[in-house]
Amino acid sequence: EQVKRALETTIKKSGMDSNVHIRLIVSRGIKKTPYQSPKGTIGNPTVVIIPEYKKASDEVKEKGITLATVTTRRDHAVQDPRINSLSKHNCIAACIEADQLGVNEGLMLDPNGFVATCNSTNFFIVRSGEVWTSTGEYCLNGITRGTIIRLCKEYGIPILEKNFIPADVHSADEVFVTGTFAGVIPVISV
């Protein structure tokens, strides 16, 4: 309830009333030394609320984006890939690699070589009337991803959370990505 009130107050004070994207950051709080142990925390958690004007590109929504499979993996070796954290070194590395390859997003594989997610969006394919997405073990189980899964179930569209390989992606009928900011975006090439 406190966070909700703080969000509402921040938006009101900012004067923003449309296309507002909120970045909410919560840390354990101030430290008595730069040591990382939670034992050194003084007081309550620190909450940072950053409102910014941000609008998803209509052109991107209509024309779609390009992907390439990157060498950077999503795995538990560095951090739990299901947590939305500022410490996303592997996602940043995948983003840099995608940029070097001249594409919009990097398609990331899990440690076993199965499709996991993209560096900043969730990944789906459509094959023979079925919608496929990763198992969720190596991706942030995002809000929009969850909505797509729920809607498929509600409307009787077969939705499979499963392991699949890049070859399945290349022979898919359709490919799309999802994110809370931009919604559902078509993928025009992988």
Named regions from a protein language model:
Residues 1-107, 111-112, 150-190:
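Conserved alpha/beta cores of soluble small-molecule-handling proteins
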Residues 106-107, 114-136, 141:
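Glycine- and Gly-Pro-enriched alpha-helical subdomains that act as flexible
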Residues 142-147:
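Feature captures the catalytic cores and cofactor-binding loops of soluble hydro-lyases/lyases
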